[in-house]
């Protein structure tokens, strides 16, 4: 990227370890100057599986192991740092490095992760997913419409605090529960993340954690995730902005001697798009004569109402239409069918990243009838214009705010 005009007004600067104390690099949750615009914010704060690096910086203020939770809309990744030991990625019992942020209720039990998704195919109203989207949302939020658009069978209501709660399914053995607040559901998932860390750490107690949050989170949303963590006894050392943490991770094992290096970090998740632009450089300390690496976050931008889940739904809607055309039966509104097609759309979307066209066969989808069709990358491209037309805008906004312009052309890459 080439500078059109020197950016000014960025007094905050991050210095990269090992040449700095962590208090200078990352601050505890700060509710001042949080995003109020739905689109962009200049400033500096901290990202995702990169959380493992950020967590390591907090050992200086913690007396025991610190848990890092990359708390995404669809999945979460967990890392642990022990005193005197390098950080490690926490894997589940199947050695998978990411875990669905999901919980299912039934028979007086709670089941999490991939097992929850598997059981959800049979009881889709009992499995709660994407619950982080509810955090801090008020009465004017369109979050309920978002779940409806993606064919989730949830019922919502406003609480006395004007936040959202989700209807609890009947017949699960938890007869005293009618609704669960957003904080309560997310607290359960955060507690599961902590329990995974405890199991990975041979039963050692874990209290302290660092949690990633989207750049666009407001004070209310940040407070909501802190409240969720406190419900299960987790002490949040810091909330870290996802794309800024990615910029921090980018500096590891890199030198920027005698040059300024500018990088755009573009993160398209399941529920939102986030972009940040950072400027990296190295200066020589006058006292120690040692190099110190610095970076400024020049700008941030986002679209918090679009993400990969909407592309998956393009395929799910196609499969539904194909089934109706083949059999003359219309299972729209059937929670089990819509759950299976949404999962199928997610799977095929990923496979079409490296394939042009694939056969699709889903047995016994509805009333003993099978779905037999095809899915192609071209179909997604032809039918997702309302989505894809919004993908570039945050990047352009970030460039504008940073007074930068792109030099060069694009290159295709597989997702």
Regions found by a protein language model. Give the residues of each.
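Classical eukaryotic N-terminal signal peptides for Sec-dependent ER targeting/secretion
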Residues: 2, 29-30, 34-54
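Positively charged N-terminal leader segments that act as targeting/secretion signals
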Residues: 6-9, 13, 43, 308
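Oxyanion-binding/catalytic loops of NTP- or PPi-dependent enzymes
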Residues: 48, 60-146, 159, 173-175, ...
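Generic recognition of long tandem-repeat/solenoid scaffolds
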Residues: 112, 163-169
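Short amphipathic beta-strand and strand-loop transition segments with alternating hydrophobic
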Residues: 151-157
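Amphipathic alpha-helical coiled-coil/leucine-zipper-like oligomerization segments
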Residues: 181-193
């Amino acid at each position: 990227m080439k500078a059109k005009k020197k950016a000014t007004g960025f007094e905050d600067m991050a210095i990269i370890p090992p040449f700095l104390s962590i208090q200078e690099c990352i601050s505890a949750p700060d509710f001042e100057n949080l995003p109020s615009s739905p689109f962009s914010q200049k400033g500096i704060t901290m990202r995702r599986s990169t959380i493992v690096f950020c967590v390591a910086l907090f050992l200086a203020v913690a007396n025991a192991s610190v848990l890092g939770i990359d708390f995404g809309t669809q999945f979460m990744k967990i890392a642990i740092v022990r005193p005197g030991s390098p950080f490690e990625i926490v894997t589940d019992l199947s050695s998978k490095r990411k875990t669905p942020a999901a919980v299912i209720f039934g028979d007086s039990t709670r089941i999490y992760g991939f097992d929850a998704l598997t059981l959800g195919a049979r009881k889709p109203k009992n499995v709660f997913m994407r619950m982080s989207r509810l955090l801090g949302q008020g009465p004017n939020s369109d979050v309920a419409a978002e779940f409806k658009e993606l064919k989730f069978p949830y019922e919502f209501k406003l609480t006395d605090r004007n936040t959202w709660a989700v209807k609890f399914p009947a017949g699960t053995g938890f007869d005293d529960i009618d609704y669960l607040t957003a904080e309560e559901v997310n607290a359960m998932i955060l507690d599961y993340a902590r329990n995974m860390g405890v199991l990975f750490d041979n039963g050692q107690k874990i209290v302290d954690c660092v949690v990633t949050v989207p750049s666009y989170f407001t004070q209310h949303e940040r407070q909501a995730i802190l409240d969720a963590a406190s419900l299960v006894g987790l002490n949040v050392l810091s909330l870290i902005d996802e794309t800024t943490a990615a910029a921090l991770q980018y500096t590891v094992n890199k030198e920027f001697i005698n040059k300024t290096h500018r990088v755009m970090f573009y993160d398209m998740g399941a529920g939102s798009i986030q972009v940040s632009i950072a400027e990296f450089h190295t200066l020589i300390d006058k006292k120690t004569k040692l190099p110190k690496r610095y970076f400024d976050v020049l700008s941030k931008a986002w679209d918090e109402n679009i993400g990969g889940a909407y592309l998956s739904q393009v395929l799910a809607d196609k499969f539904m239409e194909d089934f109706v055309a083949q059999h003359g039966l219309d299972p729209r509104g059937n929670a089990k069918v819509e759950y299976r097609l949404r999962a199928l759309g997610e799977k095929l979307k990923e496979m079409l990243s490296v394939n042009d066209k694939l056969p699709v066969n889903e047995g016994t989808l509805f009333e003993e009838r099978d779905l037999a069709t095809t899915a192609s990358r071209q179909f997604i491209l032809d039918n997702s214009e309302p989505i894809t037309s919004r993908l570039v805008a945050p990047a352009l906004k970030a460039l504008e705010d940073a007074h930068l312009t792109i030099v060069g052309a694009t290159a295709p890459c597989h997702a």
